[in-house]
Amino acid sequence: MLSILKKLFGTANDRTVKKLFSEITKINSLEPAIQKLSDEELKNKTVEFKEKLKNGATLDDIVYEAFAVVREAAKRVCGMRHFDVQLIGGLILHRGMITEMRTGEGKTLVATLPAYLNALTGKGVHVVTVNDYLARRDSASMGKIYNFLGLSVGCIVGGMPDEVKRAAYNADITHATNNELGFDYLRDNMKYSLQERVLRPFNFAIIDEVDSILIDEARTPLVISGPVNDNAELYGKIDKIVRLLNASDFEKDEKLKTINLTETGITHIESLLSKENIIKPDTSLYDFENLTLVHYVNQALRAHNMFTVNVDYLVREGKVMIIDEFTGRVMEGRRYSEGLHQALEAKENVKIQNENQTLASITFQNYFRNYPKLSGMTGTAMTEAPELKDIYNLDVVAVPTHNKVTRLDLDDEIYGSKKEKYDAILKLIRDCYDRGQPMLVGTISIEKSEELSSVLNKEKIPHKVLNAKFHEQEAFIIAQAGRFKAVTIATNMAGRGTDIMLGGNPEMLIEQLDKEHNYEAKIAEIKAQIAEEKKQVIEAGGLFVIGTERHESRRIDNQLRGRSGRQGDPGKTKFFLSLDDDLMRIFASDRISGVLRTLGLKDGEAIHHPMISRSLEKAQQKVEGHNYEMRKNLLRFDDVMNDQRKIIYEQRTEIIKSKDSHGFLNSTTEELAKKIVLTFMPVGSYREDWDIENLSVELHRVFSIKFDHNVVSKNDVTEEEITKTVIQMAHYIYKSKEEAYSSELMHNAMKYILLTTLDQVWKDHLYSLDHLRQGISLRAYGQKDPLSEYKREAFNLFEQMLNNLKELFIQTVYHFHIDLKNVQKEDVSLEYKKLQKNMRESREDPAFSKYNAGSSLETDLKPVVSRIDPKDRNPDDPTSWGRVSRNELCPCGSGKKYKYCHGANE
């Protein structure tokens, strides 16, 4: 019934596209008039549009004319005219939706339409892509159109200085990678003045390869971190011990990606740990004193049994580097958390880096939800449409191709073993190579690509390998994959964003030329050669895409297929599978094995059966559903931190903007004074129960007040009067500082102390949340909802953090002093700014993890309570410890956290 209705009325997508086509006629009707404009008149249209917006017009009022102007500019500058389907894609993007357009349909050109239109507001547009190469390429090629129309263009890539980034972000249209945008947002919220920040307020983002960024990378948060405890030696020792375990000592679940010691395994590892003097004889791994070792053992087990080199990570230049499972690319600057990365470094016998503590983090899910208006484009989004709608409130519209797709998608071939599968692939590659048909062979990992490469080397078949190890050559290799007799092996979607043109890409070959010798003649020669090869390739059948395995996601398989048949070109695709493949083995092997036994599969023989295809699709849907739930669950937990992050970042901005910090100082002084007095002089208590001695100690610790006991000797004194006296004394101390140092210097000092203190307590809070998150799932065994428990405890920790902020701020303000011996009064402000600058620069060093007001201003700005090097602390003398973070291990050596030991009463 549903299929009949769809035939009669079309799908919702068909109806949307039909409606959009009716709007395209309005743009096309403007083309003759726009074509008659001179270059100068066309450029002046930008000024005209801005004036209309200034006078109250909306973007929708000028959308058709603006699109017509961009189309004409693209034709004059780049020789490219937007097709009607590209105009439809532009309207979809402008309206805050995702457009699904096949590979080769010119998505980069489509983005110029909404980017230009929305940039007219002057609030900036971000065009987001997945790597530096694409950001540079698109800003250079499409930037010509924007510049022609009088708009500025910026490009953001890794390693740029802040001044260059700031200028790029201030441009009308900025091309940037998703990673740099996220990290710049985090870095900006660690800066100490608004002038240092590089980003403008969020406005509109167009995300290229939107499925890759919003779905594939959603599970991996961006993290800025600093090193903590040096446990490298322990990781090394545990690694050696784990290598001695037998297969029966642990059990793993590949579906859930978990691993646990068995009873025999626990006994075995306890014996090994005891021999190495890591635990005491006759103690258990799970005794309280040894509990921290469980974490090291578990991570070493995971490193050796759940993670594979050249599949999950690779080792390059003595470093373990994570491979993105969806793209096959190295994830630069990313490290596994919770000690897993250190365990992998121990496994691979490279230098073990210190464990990191989170200083700032955000997921792409929460970063991109900051934009008031968000859109995206990709070749494959319909399979993930429900998730994109649910999480980002983004609708997906599939746009028809400009030319009819002539690509032929052949049925899968399934073999009993990997060897039989490779034999069949090799035979097909040999046949295609002999007739000159180019091939793109997709693998799911570096390991598999190198495995296949060695097979082709033995057969003496020339080929190129494209994987994370050769990232720099990625675009060039993939661009030439359509040449005559070309054989290219690629991991997943490596090279995504670069078209494969039949016969080859002449522009990239021309870029390789030496401009000094016969440049023009060589260009003509290359173009002639490419044209000839294109004819030969079309005669041979176009690009043949071979999939060596099904991916967990149907979308990734569709992306691989989409590399062939661009813009109506001929082509073929085919997947080769075996029962040894990961997807088949883990998720679908039993069902499919039964079918194959029934059908009587013989060695070297392929099978085609609709039941097998359905089983594979069900397996993929099962994994997609599992991954979706993981991303959704991550978002639920991250939303808790995100709400707190927004509050902290907003407060930080308010502090930086503030012209006067006295309000916060006075209110916090009064709040703490009341709290301290009531702690030692409870309401309704008898005078003899008052603890005046400890009240005096606490007032000196917090406010630097020397409290006179005689004040309390009066019979009629009350706690309210004591509180009032304390507040007056605190105000007097502050006033004295202000008179000594100047009100401007005190304001700057207070602002800076408040910012550094906020950074310190926020960092400690993130550390606490990390630990809370790690163990919260165990609450389910106690019939409690882990998410509800996490929300409740995270809120309590946040309140505690705010209380710590107030106390540390007050303590530092009332205790610090500035040495003015060598500073003239009128130069104090300048001197302080210089000191402040030095301090900030140390903050920006990612290796710097200890935020406290006294670190870099040791001679000029000295808080009484400073952090002491742990090596200089005497366990038996608490006065030698300095300030101890509540989450540090207590310096007394008890093994407990400070807040549960000597700091329990603080």
From Swiss-Prot:
Enzymatic reactions: ATP + H2O + cellular proteinSide 1 = ADP + phosphate + cellular proteinSide 2
Binding-site list for Zn(2+): 890, 892, 901-902
GO molecular-function terms, A-Z: ATP binding; metal ion binding; protein-exporting ATPase activity
Region (Disordered): 862-887
Signal peptide residue numbers: none
Residues bound to ATP: 86, 104-108, 499
Membrane topology: Peripheral membrane protein
Assigned keywords, A-Z: ATP-binding, Cell inner membrane, Cell membrane, Cytoplasm, Membrane, Metal-binding, Nucleotide-binding, Protein transport, Translocase, Translocation, Transport, Zinc
Cellular location(s): Cell inner membrane; Cytoplasm
Coiled-coil ranges from the UniProt annotation: none
Record function comment: Part of the Sec protein translocase complex. Interacts with the SecYEG preprotein conducting channel. Has a central role in coupling the hydrolysis of ATP to the transfer of proteins into and across the cell membrane, serving both as a receptor for the preprotein-SecB complex and as an ATP-driven molecular motor driving the stepwise translocation of polypeptide chains across the membrane.
Protein name, as recorded: Protein translocase subunit SecA
